[in-house]
Amino acid sequence: MGISNFASICSRTPLPLCSVIKSTTHLVLSNSTKIHDFDPQHLNIGILPKCYARSIDIANTTIFGIGNAFINIAALGVILIILYNIRQKYTAIGRSEYLYFFQLTLLLIIFTLIVNCGVSPPGSNSFPYFVAVQIGLAGACCWTLLINGFLGFNLWEDGTTKSMLLVRGFSLCGFMANFLASILTFRTWIENHEIPNTNTTALFVVVYLWNLINLFIFVICQLFVSFFIVRNLWVTGAVLLGVFFFVAGQILTYGFSSQICEGVKHYLDGLFFGSICNIFTLMMVYKTWDITTDDDLEFSVSIDKNGDVLYN
């Protein structure tokens, strides 16, 4: 797979960004026939996947990827529960930082629903911008995790204005880097749909390689904290389980999406199972933080009937 061309990725996986980039490498027809070195100049479409989940019509409204939509709606509920639990741990280390991270993931899931389900349909003028925002939010989450990974080393005081400025500053940098890489890549599509090919080198490096490095550093930091600081193998298990779900999700999404789609007769695709794995990955991120901060409460905290916080 060349990083300057998403043809091999988009032919297997119906990613939203595939609708706003082009490739002269191949075209996959409805009968799965591949045409190499074709001229897509007059086609007002992006790179077509070999197989994708079928859409449904409800009240004259077309909804794409209904199975994946249900998973993402369920993910919203999971994230809301996680946010509630984080808010209940009043004195936990990194409470504000992880609260901010999961708020970002909540926003990311909302934009994922917008681009995956056809709220902003492919081919519309707004679609490239929504896709760029979604990619930008994914980058912001990765950059936020990078900073949160260092909280266990007590390099700075958590929850302070300085700490939150650092976290929000890095998340903003991550958002801008991924958003600009995306929107500049999509610019030729926005200006002229008849372009023959899209150079995606910068998009691949920023969105895939750079964010992967950030996640790798976060995992290494968490493993170091679990082994040498908290010395709790339950933390190690949560980290490794999160890595397992993340890797499994990427493999199912990018490696076996077409096989899954054909096997279940177009009712589901790899994005469905990838989204499930992403939910479990986020749950393990929360659980890792939850276990490492389990003993932070040195006194009991309760809320009276007036909503005031009581410290005992």
Curated annotation (Swiss-Prot):
Protein name, entry field: Chitin synthase export chaperone
Species in which this protein is naturally found: Candida glabrata (strain ATCC 2001 / BCRC 20586 / JCM 3761 / NBRC 0622 / NRRL Y-65 / CBS 138)
One matching Pfam family, short form? Chs7
Does Transport appear among the keywords?
yes
Q: GO terms for biological process? A: cell wall organization; chitin biosynthetic process; endoplasmic reticulum to Golgi vesicle-mediated transport; protein folding; protein transport
Membrane topology listed for this record:
Multi-pass membrane protein
The cross-references to InterPro entries, in alphabetical order and at most eight, read: Chs7
Spell out the GO cellular component terms annotated for this protein, sorted alphabetically and separated by semicolons.
cellular bud neck; endoplasmic reticulum membrane
